[in-house]
Each structure stands twice: as C-alpha cells, then as structure tokens.
Amino acid sequence: DYVIAAVRQILKDNPIDYVKWDMNRHLTDVGSMYFEPDRQGEITHRYVLGLYYIMDVLTSEFSEILFESCSSGGGRFDPGMLYYMPQTWTSDNTDAVCRLKIQHGTSMLFPTVSMGAHVSAVPNHQVGRTTSLETRYIVAAAGNLGYELDLQKLSQDEMELIKKQIAQYKRIRRTVQFGAYYRLADPFSENQSAWNFVSEDGKQIVFSHVQILARSAYRIPTLRLRGLDPKAEYKNVETGEVFGGDELMYAGITIPRVRQDFSATMIIFEKM
C-alpha cells in the first residue's frame, strides 16, 4: 500500500505519460521471520503476487500512461508483467549486431510490439562497436522503435535522417507491430539476418536484411520472401519497380554486394 500511495502521488502531481518500471537487482538470500522454515520458499512467489497487485492498481488508475517493464540480466520477459505492461525493455545491449540474435530469439515467444528496440549512440556502450545510423534504425525498426541519443551531439544531417526514419516507421508501424513476422535468415548460423513482415490485410510488406561481416569471395545471398500472394503484384515504394508475388517468394531478392561490415537494407512493398 505504501508503494502504491507513493507512486500514485507522483503520477497525479506530474504530467507523466511513460513509466519504465525497472528492478536492477535480483532477490538474493531472501527470508522471513514470519514464515516457518518449510514455508520460506513461498516468499519469492508472494513477492511477485504483490508486484502484480501493485501493477493492477496503478495501471487501472492510470490507463492513459504507457508502462514498460524491465530488469537486468536474462529472463526479463514475463507474460504476467506483459498483462499489465504491454512492452518490455528487451536488453540493455543495444548494439545493432548483437540485437540481431537477441530480437530473433525473443520474437520466437513474444510479439514484436512488446520488444523495446532503440537506436543508441555509437561506439556502443556495451561492446564498443560502431554501426551506421541506418543499420541501427533498420534493426530497431523490427520491434517497438525508440531512440536514446543526446540530441546536442547529433549533426544536422543525422537529425534530418532520424526525422525521415521516424516518419517511415510510422508508415510501417502497424505492419511491424501487429503483422505476420517471417524469419528469412538466421543470425546464429549465418553471416546475415533477414526478415519480412506482412500487414494484417496483406497490402504492405516490409523486408529487411543485415550483412554482418563483409567478405571478399562469397555467394551473393538470395532471400525468398514469405507470406505473399503468389498471384498478386507488389510495388517497391521507393523505386516503383513491380514484382510478382510468386517471383518474390520463389525466385527471391538478390542482395547487392556491399564492401562494408554491418550494412543493412530495408525495402517496403505495396500490394497492387
């Protein structure tokens, strides 16, 4: 009740529309003088039930606020918490290359709309890797997109590019967050990662590909899209090129060779 009252007052007194609920330590050596020795195992379970109660009260009272759950370490996604908070901070590791595996695996169990995925500064604070703003965006745009950057350190060109990225994401957001998600290349076993989303009505296709390391001699990858109508035609919204659905699914898209590590491509198709 104390926690509820304290948080309630803060939310009432301030114009807050987003709360990240973080618990950056694990419960260790937990015990209670109240329970007998054979009931000590109940404590962590009761703790979680108490947390769910707090969430139930606060999210019901402040339904207009977006709550995001979070925790350090692995296993942070909890279906129980997702009942109260519709998204979770997927990982503190925001490096675009690492995120390929993180998001590939997380999406096996949880919807992409629940995966917090942000464009962060480079060199990355976790691994020290530098990737382009475009690659960071394309990887983050496979989840619930956000940016965590110091605007004072961005160039004017970067600011303009971010504006364009956000505008583009708004056009594909419904497809990415609620459409069908198809994995086309596995970053765990390949030197690439690729995926495509299909909107609920089948009218928009979002295809993305990331090359991890550039190589001198290799077979140029061809990716076959999935979930399309083989009898329909699809237009590349950027170039105006038109492809048959059967062509995209059975012949596939040939990825141009790029002599650069961590290069990425996104293509948006519209069903004609």
Protein language model features and the residues they cover:
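Glycan-recognition surfaces
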Residues: D1, A5, H45-Q152
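Aromatic- and acidic-residue-enriched carbohydrate-binding clefts of CAZyme catalytic domains
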Residues: D1, R25-Y52
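Catalytic cores of secreted or luminal carbohydrate-active enzymes
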Residues: E134-A185
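Conserved, mostly hydrophobic/aromatic
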Residues: D22, F67, A140, F207, ...
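An active-site-proximal structural segment forming one wall of the substrate-binding cleft
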Residues: D1-W21
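C-terminal beta-strand-rich structural cap/linker in extracellular carbohydrate-active enzymes
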Residues: G245-M272
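Solvent-exposed beta-hairpin/edge-strand motifs
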Residues: R226-G240
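Carbohydrate-binding surface patches
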Residues: D186-D229
